[in-house]
Amino acid sequence: MSRVPSPPPPAEMTSGPVAESWCYTQIKVVKFSYMWTINNFSFCREEMGEVIKSSTFSSGANDKLKWCLRVNPKGLDEESKDYLSLYLLLVSCPKSEVRAKFKFSILNAKGEETKAMESQRAYRFVQGKDWGFKKFIRRDFLLDEANGLLPDDKLTLFCEVSVVQDSVNISGQNTMNMVKVPDCRLADELGGLWEHSRFTDCSLCVAGQEFQAHKAILAARSPVFSAMFEHEMEESKKNRVEINDVEAEVFKEMMFFIYTGKAPNLDKMADDLLAAADKYALERLKVMCEDALCTSLSVENAAEILILADLHSADQLKTQAVDFINYHASDVMETSGWKSMVASHPHLVAEAYRSLASAQCPFLGPPRKRLKQS
C-alpha cells in the first residue's frame, strides 16, 4: 500500500519564484496483485458467453473491497468467439463507487509475464460492475503448444490492480529565511577515500594486485576483517592481508560496497559476489546477491543456483530455487545441471522432493515477492 510522503521543501519544488504559501496534494493509490491458475484448461467445456470465475481477493485482510477475475474461455459474444475474454469484477464495495486501473498478463512456462494488456485510465467500478478485454487473446494462439502459454495444460493469469483512494492536501507557509540542509554525501565521500587511496593504513593483496584500504572502515563493516585486525594475527602485525580465493574484479565490487553500501555491477557477478559476501559476513550484500539471483532463475540454471545457495547458506535464495524447481519440475529434470546435481548433491534432490511432497495442493506459480534485506 502506498503511503503519503512528506512534501518536498518549497524551494525544491521549483527553481522559479517562491510563493508565501503552498499546498502539496498526494492522491493515494493502493496497488496489489493476484495470480489465478486454471488447471486442465483445454478441457473447459463452457460455451460462448459462459463464465469461469476466480475466488475473491483484496489488497489485504482489512480491505473491504472484494474483487474477482472473470473468464469467458470461448469469448463473450459472436464477435469474440475466437478469443478468450478476461474481466476484473468488483464483487463487494462499501462505497458508492471506486476508480481503478488494471493490468492482465499470462505467465508462460518460464514464469515470465507475456501478452500483457492494461487499462489506459482509471475506470469507475460500482458493486457488480466489471471492466476488461473482450478480445484478450486468440484461442488458437493460446492453445498452440509452441507458444508455451499452457505448461502442463495450466493457464496462469496475473492481474495487477491500482485502486485510487482519497487525496490528501498538505499545506504550509514559507518564511523569508529558508534554510536548505544539504544532502548527506557520506557514501560518496567514503567511496572517494577508497577510490583515491587517501590516508590508508593497510594493504590488501588480491591476485597479484595491491589495494590500499582503511582498517577502521573494514573492521566496522565486516566482522571477519574486524577479527583479523583485533587479534594478534599476521594481518594485524604487518597491516597486510593476503586474499587468495576472490577475483580482483569481484573484490573491488565488494570493497566498493563496504565503503558506500552500493554495488553497481552486482548483476554481472552476483554468484561470485555472493561467495565473497558470505566469506566476509557482509549480510546485506549477501541478500542483495540472493535477490539478483532470484530474478535470473530459469529452467537451465535452477539446479546450479540451488547448489550455490546451499553452499553459502543463502536460505532465502534456496527456498526460492526449490519452489521454482517444483513448479517447473518436468523441464528442470531434463537439464544437465539437474543430472549433475543428482550425482554430486543428492541431499538437495531429496530436499526438493520433500518440499514437493509436503505441498497440500499443486503449486500455482513461481514466487514473486521481494527478499527481506537485513
UniProtKB/Swiss-Prot annotation:
Q: Name one GO molecular function term.
A: ubiquitin protein ligase binding
Q: What is the primary gene name for this protein? A: spop
Spell out the family assignment given in the record's similarity comment: Belongs to the Tdpoz family.
One Pfam annotation, family name?
BACK_BPM_SPOP
Q: Where in the cell is it found?
A: Nucleus; Nucleus speckle
- Which SUPFAM superfamilies does the record associate with it? POZ domain, TRAF domain-like
Please give the name of this protein. Answer: Speckle-type POZ protein
Entry remark concerning the domains of this protein: The BTB (POZ) domain mediates dimerization and interaction with CUL3.
Q: Which UniProt keywords apply?
A: Nucleus, Ubl conjugation pathway
Query: Record's superkingdom?
Result: Eukaryota
| Native species | Danio rerio
